[in-house]
Amino acid sequence: MAPAADMKWSKQALEQSYTMLNICPQRKNLNTGAWQMLEEKVREWAMRDSVLVVITGPILAKQMPTIGKTSKIAVPGQFFKVVFAPYARPSRAIAFVMPNADADKLCSEYAVSVDEVERLTGFDFFNTLPDAEQRRLESGVDADSWFQF
């Protein structure tokens, strides 16, 4: 779910951003609202912090509605984005969970801990970092350090 606007560094990368590996059904008002605002913020943060690790995806459930007549494509109820600034001093991370619905809040209001995204997805982010650093990065939600320059 890498935005095409972030893949302009090569023709191949841009083309690959439109493949099924990078696509997931999103409601229009999410994709043009809070989610789009978050993607724009991530671009700003990348300029500020030089390097970001961004992990984005759907939060899957056992039962999900589908779209399509011949090929049934599952429609997730939520999406997540985890952002890690490894070279910021101190390094920092933030996560977001947004419903696949009309998101009527500011993107900052969807901030959650990385631990919460791990609980919802079953993923273990930053597992190669020392345990103390992992706990520091994953346990809290410090939206102010991200949204205020």
Where do the PLM segments sit?
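Domain-level detector of nuclease and nuclease-like folds
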Residues: 1-149
